[in-house]
Every structure is written in C-alpha cells, then in structure tokens.
Amino acid sequence: MQILLANPRGFCAGVDRAISIVERAIEMYGAPIYVRHEVVHNRYVVDSLRERGAIFIEDIAEVPDGSILIFSAHGVSQAVRAEARARELTMLFDATCPLVTKVHMEVARASRKGKEAILIGHAGHPEVEGTMGQYNNPKGGMYLVESPDDVWKLNVKDENNLCFMTQTTLSVDDTSAVIDALHRRFPKIIGPRKDDICYATTNRQEAVRNLANDADVVLVVGSKNSSNSNRLAELAQRMGKPAYLIDSAADIQESWLQNAKCIGVTAGASAPDILVQQVIARLQALGAVGSVELRGREESIVFEVPKELRVEVKQVD
C-alpha cells in the first residue's frame, strides 16, 4: 500500500497570516486575547491557540473593556466592526483574509453605486455573513444563492442593474454552474474581473483531481466546519473514489483501507502539516510503504501581518 500526497495542500497565505496575528498578539500583549469566532476552521489550531491564551467568542459583548480583540480570517459585517470600534478596547486587529476583504470591497462598491448584488455562497457560513453585511443601501438589494435552482427562483428589483460575487471557498465546478445560470437568467449581470474563489481553494481542488485519478481512497485532513476541506472530499467522491474528511489520524478506520493499493492524502487550507505527518505515520503503521508527493502548482503568496505585530516571536511546535 502506497501513500500519495496532494500538492499543494494545507495552509494557505490567509490562514497563515490569521494564525500569526493571534500568536504574535499573545506574545506581545500576553493572555488573554479575544478572538471573534474561530480564527480558522480547524480544531487542532483552535485548541492550540486556546491553550496559549486565546479566548474565542461569538458576541463582542463577551469581551471585557480594555481587552484586545481579533476578527477571524472569515471577516465580519460592517455592523460588527462598528460595534467593536465603539467599545473601549486596548487594540483591535483584523485577521480577515485579504482575498475575503477584496470581496467585501466589491459588495461595498455595489452598495455605494446602488447596484443590486448577488452572492454565491453557503448560508450560515461566517464568511457569507460578513460579506452580506457589507451591503447597506436600502434602495438596492443583496441576495444569497447556493444553486442554479436558487437563481431561477430569485426576484430582484432591476434585472439591468445587477452584479455578483462569490464566497472564496466554494467548489469551482458548482460555482461555475451557478454563474452560468446567473448569466442565462440575467443577461446584463456583471461579475468580477476574476473569479472570487481564492487561489488556494482552486489549487487544492485541482490537486485533488490529480490525486483521485491514481488513489483508491482519499483522506482529507480538515475539520467538519471547514468549507474548503468539505469541498475537497466532495470532489474526490464525485470522481468515484471513497473519500473521508478527518480531523486527525485517530479518525482513520482500517476498514476504509481494505483492498486499497494507493491511499491519497490531502489537507484543507486551514489544516496544519503536523496533522498530515501524523496521518502518514498512522498509515505506515497500518502497512503503507513510503509516500510520494505529486507534482503541483507552486504557491509563493505571503500576506503581511499588521505593522504593530511585525516582530520576531518564539517558534511554537
């Protein structure tokens, strides 16, 4: 039994930046540091930061005056941002992924111009809630769609004054189908110059396509609430391969590997490499011999942390 590793996999630049912001804030200012929502959707990361002194909250009212607050990588609405600024906080840091901020700016621009905006995304996801919350023009409208069926059921005020944008962590294939439906339903709708689905999501889905071509079973390291990790498992399943989303090596069931000659392993954009290494070790303990990393797209994007946090911090294992 051989192990095939998808490439690229694991942390993206936005996740790396968000985690660094929390780590550096703890290092510079000391615990506790308050974070609105899980900074990224990974149980291992959140538990590790909690052990170091991060306190994850959903309501800013839970944050005591004089505290330091960080927004998660998923972004927040204008209302949440205004609420935080009205509080007597010592410091406020924004760990929103810059690629999510780009979508926020598209929505805010549409709101200012009075255009109606349609967001392709998953209801209830914090990124979607934050993005929808950038629109505040009562004369226009902001709508959420998840599928082509939603598009055909949608009622807007002015079909000639529409634009759309997307959540950054969607299935490339599913989103393409929704965009096609939007163009058929609303021929004059305007979209972003470049797809809002981020480079990391696109690259990891492409890597899973390559992986699933050769693997008998695919293991995706990522938490259940991670949108991009779920999309990786779904993609492998659509390609006809058994695929399992796992938080850690402890989740692996031997029955999944029966008769498998090649096990594919990848990781969502919020899953650290240590979890992948533990999965490899577990598979080797179950009889896998060696691992091979597939060729894939090189990623060199780096997002800077806020200037107030640009100091050397201790390396944490």
UniProtKB/Swiss-Prot annotation:
Residues annotated for isopentenyl diphosphate binding in this entry: 41, 74, 125, 226-228, 270
Catalytic activity line of the entry: isopentenyl diphosphate + 2 oxidized [2Fe-2S]-[ferredoxin] + H2O = (2E)-4-hydroxy-3-methylbut-2-enyl diphosphate + 2 reduced [2Fe-2S]-[ferredoxin] + 2 H(+); dimethylallyl diphosphate + 2 oxidized [2Fe-2S]-[ferredoxin] + H2O = (2E)-4-hydroxy-3-methylbut-2-enyl diphosphate + 2 reduced [2Fe-2S]-[ferredoxin] + 2 H(+)
GO terms under biological process: dimethylallyl diphosphate biosynthetic process; isopentenyl diphosphate biosynthetic process, methylerythritol 4-phosphate pathway; terpenoid biosynthetic process
One annotated GO molecular function is: 4 iron, 4 sulfur cluster binding
Q: How is the cofactor bound?
A: Binds 1 [4Fe-4S] cluster per subunit.
What is the top EC class of this enzyme, as a single word? Answer: oxidoreductase
Residues binding [4Fe-4S] cluster are: 12, 97, 198
Q: What's the family? A: Belongs to the IspH family.
**What is the protein's given name?**
4-hydroxy-3-methylbut-2-enyl diphosphate reductase
Q: What is the source species?
A: Yersinia enterocolitica serotype O:8 / biotype 1B (strain NCTC 13174 / 8081)
